[in-house]
């Protein structure tokens, strides 16, 4: 095998893409299966001059990235299913006020805690239309691992 070829999971691709794009602020709460994004960023982001904050919940995570984005930071948080539900009010605020934020929703297979450590595609509708108000939401999704890098 070519030594330049490396097999990695979608969450790992997301981390590499975010760092490559200049991510300099991450706030998150550990919730599987999105923990695989927070874990490597915890050690790697500070080495690149960025800030990593472990928050008390998903609501605070969303509030933190909104605040950091307002100061000019490139921001991201990662969550899954029920955590994404908790972010909806703050997400709606960010959309209405046009505050740039990247929210990675690593979707679980099945409803809410159906398969908490596996992934699925059931949250696409919530990503697109989950908040209150009448506004447009950009909700890109990756259909294959090699799409994760440009999507992130």
Cite the ranges covered by each PLM segment.
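Thiamine diphosphate
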Residues: 1-129
């Amino acid at each position: 095998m070519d030594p330049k070829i490396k097999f990695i999971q979608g969450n790992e691709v997301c981390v590499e893409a975010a760092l490559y794009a200049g991510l300099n602020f991450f706030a998150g709460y550990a919730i599987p299966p999105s923990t695989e994004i927070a874990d490597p960023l915890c050690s790697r982001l500070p080495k690149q001059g960025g800030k990593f904050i472990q928050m008390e919940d998903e609501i605070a995570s969303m509030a933190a990235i909104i605040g950091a984005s307002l100061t000019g930071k490139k921001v991201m948080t990662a969550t899954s299913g029920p955590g994404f539900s908790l972010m909806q009010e703050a997400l709606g605020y960010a959309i209405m006020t046009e505050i740039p934020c990247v929210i990675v929703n690593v979707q679980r297979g099945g409803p809410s805690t159906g398969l908490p450590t596996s992934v699925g595609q059931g949250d696409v509708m919530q990503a697109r239309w989950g908040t209150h108000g009448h506004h447009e939401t950009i909700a890109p999704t990756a259909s294959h691992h090699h799409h994760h890098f440009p999507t992130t």
